[in-house]
Amino acid sequence: MLAARTGAAGSQISEENTKLRRQSGFSVAGKDKSPKKASENAKDSSLSPSGESQLRARQLALLREVEMNWYLKLCDLSSEHTTVCTTGMPHRNLGKSGLRVSCLGLGTWVTFGGQISDEVAERLMTIAYESGVNLFDTAEVYAAGKAEVILGSIIKKKGWRRSSLVITTKLYWGGKAETERGLSRKHIIEGLKGSLQRLQLEYVDVVFANRPDSNTPMEEIVRAMTHVINQGMAMYWGTSRWSAMEIMEAYSVARQFNMIPPVCEQAEYHLFQREKVEVQLPELYHKIGVGAMTWSPLACGIISGKYGNGVPESSRASLKCYQWLKERIVSEEGRKQQNKLKDLSPIAERLGCTLPQLAVAWCLRNEGVSSVLLGSSTPEQLIENLGAIQVLPKMTSHVVNEIDNILRNKPYSKKDYRS
């Protein structure tokens, strides 16, 4: 039947597809077919590693658009049926895997099962999903498992297609017993089974090791992650709060024993925390394909501006278990950060956005970041943060340099990494 549908029509579409490729200036293999001047060829040959990556990214995006046009015509659909068109939410590959994730995701740390009610959680997920977000992140430790329960219940209630979602969870702190925490084979398998039961799902898309475990051999960790993937309990695995050396060790073990390596590292990334994502992870991406999924783009709310005049009673820093955040805010370094935020405000005003939107867009301007996880406690906060998508095109090199001149914390690497 498919052959019948794609007979004459398929031939016509193929011809149109070929025309589109010619217009785009490159073939499926990525080779330039358009004539170039000698000066242009010389210019291309001198591209920096980052320039080459950006050129390749643009070529892949154009090729993906060509293929999407072909598919839509084949199915007698228009581009209006695609999520990107209807919501404007860009998607990126998770590392060098084929998994496509929305460049903004919704996290559940502190909020789900703790700071907000189940009704507010449902509103947040609905707003995110209808805005094109397909990535929802949680962990077994969040609210002692309650965050997973709430997340799973909302997905079931909404009836969203499982294939349209990317659900991730993290393992390490599962319970009080010695065998209920860590990254032993026992806890990875049992912990993930428990997460799936709470989520009411057959599998998660990515399971993360929530921190390194010095008490468990790396081979055991990698074998356990490979096992849960082979058993269909997860599609991919990644790391969180791991050092570059530890991630590289996991990759080496996986290659040595023909197992599955990690595809992503979850790392903190914001205006005041840059070293790991901007210096260490690019090396891992170019060498072994490990991408970056970042969290806390507003530095636990510090960048939101709510702490400019102290710590509000309803804020995260006012919670008993977050005294460390309160201490950070009232410290000398915290006061310096607040002053820098005041200096950044004119840039946000000039771009027609809020400071939180500027901060999230600043994270997204890094093409090495696959997705930025948002943590919002109100629908208004989430809608505001999602608005960073409209600010992203305004993040020119001039604007980024302005921000760097104010922050004065840009990390530098002596190496160039080529893919």
From Swiss-Prot:
In brain, expression is most prominent in caudate nucleus, hippocampus and thalamus. Significant expression also detected in amygdala and subthalamic nucleus. Also expressed in both healthy and cardiomyopathic heart. Up to four times more abundant in left ventricle than left atrium. One of its GO terms (biological process) is learning or memory. It catalyses: a primary alcohol + NADP(+) = an aldehyde + NADPH + H(+); a secondary alcohol + NADP(+) = a ketone + NADPH + H(+). Changing residue 316 to E: Nearly abolishes NADPH binding. The active site is at residue 142. Disulfide bonds: none annotated. Its main location: cytoplasm. Its EC number is 1.1.1.-. Changing residue 307 to F: Reduces affinity for NADPH. Residues 30-43 have a biased composition (Basic and acidic residues). GO terms for cellular component: cytoplasmic side of plasma membrane; cytosol; juxtaparanode region of axon; plasma membrane; potassium channel complex; voltage-gated potassium channel complex. Residues 1-52 are annotated as: Disordered. Keywords: Cell membrane, Cytoplasm, Ion transport, Membrane, NADP, Oxidoreductase, Potassium, Potassium transport, Transport. NADP(+) binds at residues 108-109, 115, 137, 210, 240-241, 266, 295-300, 306, 316, 375, 377, 381, 384-385. It is a peripheral membrane protein. It is an enzyme of class 1 (oxidoreductase). InterPro entries: K_chnl_volt-dep_bsu_KCNAB, K_chnl_volt-dep_bsu_KCNAB-rel, K_chnl_volt-dep_bsu_KCNAB1, NADP_OxRdtase_dom, NADP_OxRdtase_dom_sf. One of its GO terms (molecular function) is molecular function inhibitor activity. Homotetramer. Interaction with tetrameric potassium channel alpha subunits gives rise to a heterooctamer. Identified in potassium channel complexes containing KCNA1, KCNA2, KCNA4, KCNA5, KCNA6, KCNAB1 and KCNAB2. Part of a complex containing KCNA1, KCNA4 and LGI1; interaction with LGI1 inhibits down-regulation of KCNA1 channel activity. Interacts with the dimer formed by GNB1 and GNG2; this enhances KCNA1 binding. Interacts with SQSTM1. Regulatory subunit of the voltage-gated potassium (Kv) Shaker channels composed of pore-forming and potassium-conducting alpha subunits and of regulatory beta subunits. The beta-1/KCNAB1 cytoplasmic subunit mediates closure of delayed rectifier potassium channels by physically obstructing the pore via its N-terminal domain and increases the speed of channel closure for other family members. Promotes the inactivation of Kv1.1/KCNA1, Kv1.2/KCNA2, Kv1.4/KCNA4, Kv1.5/KCNA5 and Kv1.6/KCNA6 alpha subunit-containing channels. The N-terminal domain of the beta subunit mediates closure of delayed rectifier potassium channels by physically obstructing the pore. Belongs to the shaker potassium channel beta subunit family. This is Voltage-gated potassium channel subunit beta-1. It comes from Homo sapiens (Human). The lineage of its organism: Eukaryota, Metazoa, Chordata, Craniata, Vertebrata.
